[in-house]
Amino acid sequence: MTAEIQQPPSQPPAQSSPMSAATDKHGGQPSAMESASCATKTKKTNAGIRRPEKPPYSYIALIVMAIQSSPTKRLTLSEIYQFLQSRFPFFRGSYQGWKNSVRHNLSLNECFIKLPKGLGRPGKGHYWTIDPASEFMFEEGSFRRRPRGFRRKCQALKPMYSMMNGLGFNHIPESYSFQGASGTISCPPNSLSLDSGIGMMNGHLPSNVDGMGLSGHPVSHLAANGAHSYMGSCTGSSGGDYSHHDSGSPLLGGGGVMEPHSVYSSPASAWAPSASTPYIKQQPLSPCNTAANPLSSSLSSHSLDQSYLHQNSHNTASELQGIPRYHSQSPSMNDRKEFVFSFNAMASSSMHSGSGSYYHQQVGYQDIKPCVM
């Protein structure tokens, strides 16, 4: 009896064990489903979060900022990466495509120069620095994005700005020195040189002009220089030297008279006018005679009024004939004469502009006799 009574209690634990296991299995399924649902929720929340916004600078500007932050003004590629990641949150995320952009901008832009490695630094790790010619693009910390083609425009405008800054409108003060109403006017020679050595034939001037002097001041010959400058050296004298000149000329408003000297010659040789010594009229000569004749100082004083230059069409070498006119101040003097000066291979542009500027009428009677050679 006792054995039969003890057996039934032993059976329920055996029967209850499968039920408990089944209940445990059913209870474990909701825990796995809950974990899966939590994972999907986290993925959805991560997908909705945007990465940090990209900085409002171009990659060129970012690289320049990194290089300029270094005391040595040069950085390696890894150091540039570290600077960008430490300063901008955009470069700290999982996106790594910005590194390719940095490398491409370093290698493809002329703003950056790859420095050669030292002997003690093998392998990779070149230093990068900024080209000195491109530093003006980032003056005063201007790193904002520029429109496309901005750098090309800057390079195109940089020589123009430097040229405009170097230019000045000081040509008149540099070329002319006005020292007052009765002072002198000096004109330094220009710096233009003729390609071919345009010289003046020394044979003509001694035969025609040698005897004519300025009472102790002979006329200096025009020296033929192989590389002489194309110039019009002129000096000024006071109005008392030429008393017969009009005061209505634009250049003679202050009483000063400007006279051309030694055109197409060196600055050393000049026709220097005497302050109180008049020109001496000599023995009459034939207008067309080019031979040398002695000149005597037996006539009254004369002053040089004006020299004309006109083109001789018969000469293929563009020969010019200058005809200076001499005006008599004395009413008793009736003789007039002309001296013909032959200047070969001379350009007439500057001489016309130089001699025509001080043309003015005379009160006395004048006559021009053309010479037909």
UniProtKB/Swiss-Prot annotation:
SUPFAM superfamilies: Winged helix' DNA-binding domain. GO terms for biological process: animal organ morphogenesis; BMP signaling pathway; cell differentiation; embryonic digestive tract development; positive regulation of DNA-templated transcription; regulation of DNA-templated transcription; regulation of transcription by RNA polymerase II; smooth muscle tissue development. Residues 54-148 bind DNA. GO terms for cellular component: nucleus. The keyword Membrane does not apply. Probable transcription factor. Required for smooth muscle (visceral mesoderm) differentiation during gut development. Also required for normal proliferation of the lateral plate mesoderm. Acts as a downstream mediator of bmp4-signaling. InterPro entries: Fork_head_dom, Forkhead_box_regulator, TF_fork_head_CS_1, TF_fork_head_CS_2, WH-like_DNA-bd_sf, WH_DNA-bd_sf. The keyword Oxidoreductase does not apply. CDD domains: FH_FOXF1. Keywords: Developmental protein, Differentiation, DNA-binding, Nucleus, Transcription, Transcription regulation. PANTHER family: FORKHEAD BOX PROTEIN BINIOU (PTHR46262), FORKHEAD BOX PROTEIN F1 (PTHR46262:SF1). GO terms for molecular function: DNA binding; DNA-binding transcription factor activity; DNA-binding transcription factor activity, RNA polymerase II-specific; RNA polymerase II cis-regulatory region sequence-specific DNA binding. This is Forkhead box protein F1-A. It is found in: Nucleus. It comes from Xenopus laevis (African clawed frog). During neurulation and tailbud stages, expressed in the lateral plate mesoderm and in the neural crest-derived structures of the head and branchial arches. During tailbud stages, expressed in the pronephros and pronephros ducts and in cells that migrate from the dorsolateral plate to the ventral region of the embryo (with the notable exception of the heart). These cells may represent hematopoietic or endothelial progenitor cells. Residues 13-22 have a biased composition (Low complexity). Transmembrane segments: none annotated.
